[in-house]
Amino acid sequence: CYQAEEEVLKFHLQEAMQRVNMDAQPNGFATIIMDELNPDKIKKLKTACHEIAVKGDFIKYKNIYSGVLTECSSQSAGIQLADFAAGIMNGYLRGALLSRGKYEFATDLFNEFILPNLRHHPDGRIMGYGVREVPSDTTIRNKLSALFER
């Protein structure tokens, strides 16, 4: 099943925007800032972000800026922190799903810094709140649930 890159980017961005908007409610405000390394992809993401924010979906984006701002990652502590978190998550998932036992350091960092800060339901569930599979896939969700719902 092939989908155009723009649609895939829009789908992932929409997932992120929904989470950010929910966390910013009722009185907060959020802005999405991305690394400016890939101008073509940034242009597609900016277009997708604007379409989602203006045309909307089932969520009204009142608490999120209707565009994407870009910044050089070497000058942005926020982007560097996001890269650090993504790297830890990548290492944790690789170790848990692909090569058990070879990613102890990433697992330790995940348990100390990422897991306690993941968005979760009031009952403690992380899947569907702080971790979502995109697009929805029951097989992948079951594998991830085993890792995040301890």
Regions found by a protein language model. Name each.
Residues C1-R150:
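A two-mode feature
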